[in-house]
Amino acid sequence: REAVSPMRKSGFFPRLALVNLMRNGRFYGPYLLSCGMTAAMYYILSYLTFSDIVASVRGAGYLQSLMYLGRLVVTLFSAVLLLYANSFVMKRRRRELGLYNILGLEKRHTARLMVWETLYCAAAAIVGGLAAGVLLSKLVLLLLLQLSPLPVEYGFEISLSGMADTAALFGFLFLLTLVWNLFGLLRSRPVELLHSAS
């Protein structure tokens, strides 16, 4: 009976991607933490932008304009941060990626691995960022209401529009990093990767 290659087994690449992320935790830990923090900031600004309570505060138009400007600033900051941090992490994994080729993985296999790694990173950063944003958004709203004579409401509110906007933005940014990584993989040569600094 013909032996089945491990790479053809179901779940091989998802498991290997998870192992890689854990093994490179010293790089991916700060990377995911920074991504999650910016996702939380974006959600909080979106939450305040769409909040009916903020809309009823004196000077609401001015406040909402500030929130829109804040979302734009966080968007630009997040794009720069993700691309720079991703480049930093991938430079330190170049030798590892070159070794995969020596061990028999073709570039298409490494590309599949990168896809799974990006999916895991995106899920962790978006879910973690939204969770932190939801928890902190009420606190930020309470601080804002100190500037208003309106009574403080202690209920818990979640902005579905804010969650959707946050997930869409950071999903797109992680997609950009994946495309960039795949482009770099296609242009690279295994020998160059192996002689790169780890």
Question: What do these predicted regions represent?
Answer:
Residues 1-29, 92-96, 106, 141-162, ...:
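Feature of multi-pass inner-membrane transport and sensor proteins
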Residues 26-53, 62-98, 119-132:
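Hydrophobic alpha-helical transmembrane segments of multi-pass inner-membrane transport and secretion
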Residues 39-50, 84-88, 120-150, 161-187:
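Small-residue-rich transmembrane alpha-helices
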Residues 59-76, 148-176:
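Conserved transmembrane alpha-helices of multi-pass membrane proteins
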Residues 99-100, 113, 153:
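Short alpha-helical segment immediately N-terminal to, or the first helix within
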